[in-house]
A protein has these predicted regions:
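Helix-to-loop junction immediately C-terminal to a conserved catalytic motif
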Residues: 51
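Conserved ABC transporter NBD signature motif
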Residues: 59-67, 76
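Conserved ABC ATPase "signature" region
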Residues: 110-128
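Conserved signature/switch motifs of ABC ATPase nucleotide-binding domains
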Residues: 131-134, 152-153, 183
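Catalytic Walker B motif of ABC-type/P-loop ATPase nucleotide-binding domains
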Residues: 157-161
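Helical segment within the ABC ATPase nucleotide-binding domain
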Residues: 171-183
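Glycine/charge-rich catalytic "coupling/switch" loops of P-loop NTPases
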Residues: 251-295, 316-345
């Protein structure tokens, strides 16, 4: 894989806060790199540095072998595009928004028209040119923002939580597009959606408190001990009801958590904390969902199950329980867990 970025002992400070702490790595083209970690781990800061929106406080950033500094960073910005979780739009139609970057680069009107149509086709929004960009659904807006990035044919595409607030249909479309683009250019995704990373990323960078904990092939990262208990991580919007957080994680699934924090949150439920049954069971658990088993993984005395409830949950039970309950792929099951089992990430 051809190296695009090289970071040598890169650190980034905001006042006295160290957002990145002596990061050294290389990122190649023609592959998708995933960046994972808890909130505040430094994922977005890393993307901003790769996009040229921020410069390292210390260390060196190289792009195609050339060091990036205050003079050369403008050139990096022309070939690296970042897509944030909540995109901003100009007033007006979709065409105006997608064409904006081409206009300031002085493309002809004829070429702009052709390139906008092609970009909208790439994101499965054919015929959306005259639609009001600010009145589209969240999923459509995210795809318009992606079209606005792709129309510039960037060498590098940087994505910050690209599907966190999308429904399943739009998230699936975005995932397909990202997979296609990963074959053409350098793509880096920062996200809490571990299932998406496992599906898309060739390599994964695991950050914690601004430092690289592990970097390597995605399969190796997720089969290792560091991430064994980091399944069931969800981004959602929390509202407080009687002091309890009700977190909407999408697709009609709402998790009740024993903390009081409104707004956007990232939560984690350990697979071992989820109780599995073949029927409704009256317990003190505040979270109860009906689902269907989509996968069973044999881990010796333990079995790890994937259960689709509208959102995918990973549940870990003993092999004995799996056999005694007569469970297999496509079995209908019920899962429950306490509000106190839901942790902020």
């Amino acid at each position: 894989v051809e190296s695009v970025y090289e970071l040598h002992s890169v650190s980034k400070f905001y006042d006295n806060v160290r957002a990145l702490d002596v990061i050294s790595l290389s990122i190649g083209t023609g592959e998708i790199t995933g960046v994972i970690g808890r909130s505040g781990a430094g994922k977005t800061t890393l993307l901003k540095i790769l996009a040229g929106l921020e410069l390292p406080t210390a260390g060196k950033l190289l792009f195609k072998g050339d060091e990036i500094d205050r003079k050369s960073v403008r050139q990096l910005r022309r070939v690296a595009t970042i897509l944030f979780q909540t995109p901003l739009f100009l007033r007006g139609d979709v065409y105006t928004n997608v064409a904006y970057g081409l206009r300031i680069r002085n493309h002809s009107r004829e070429s702009i028209g052709k390139m906008v149509v092609e970009a909208l086709s790439l994101v499965r929004l054919d015929g959306f040119e005259d639609r009001d960009a600010r009145r589209l659904s969240g999923g459509e807006q995210q795809r318009v923002a992606l079209a606005r990035a792709l129309v510039l044919d960037p060498r590098v595409l940087l994505l910050d939580e690209p599907t966190s607030n999308l429904d399943r249909a739009n998230a699936s479309v975005m995932t397909e597009i990202i997979e296609e683009e990963g074959e053409k250019r350098c793509v880096v995704i920062a996200t809490h959606d571990y299932e998406q990373i496992k599906k898309l990323a060739d390599r994964t960078i695991f950050l914690e408190a601004g430092r690289i904990v592990e970097v390597g092939a995605t399969d190796s990262i997720f089969s290792g001990p560091l991430l064994a208990n980091m399944e069931n991580v969800y981004t959602g919007v929390s509202r407080l009801v009687d002091g309890i957080s009700h977190v909407d994680i999408g697709n009609g699934v709402e998790i009740k958590a024993a903390f009081s924090r409104p707004g956007r949150v990232v939560v984690h439920v350990s697979p071992e904390d989820i109780i599995l049954s073949k029927g409704w069971v009256e317990t003190s658990a505040r979270n109860e969902f009906k689902g269907r088993i989509t996968a069973v993984e044999d881990l010796g005395p333990i079995a790890r199950l994937k259960i689709d409830t509208g959102k995918s949950f990973t549940v870990q039970i003993t092999k004995r329980s799996l056999i005694d309950m007569g469970l297999n792929v496509d079995s209908e099951v019920y899962l429950s867990f306490k509000a106190s089992s839901v942790e902020l990430v």
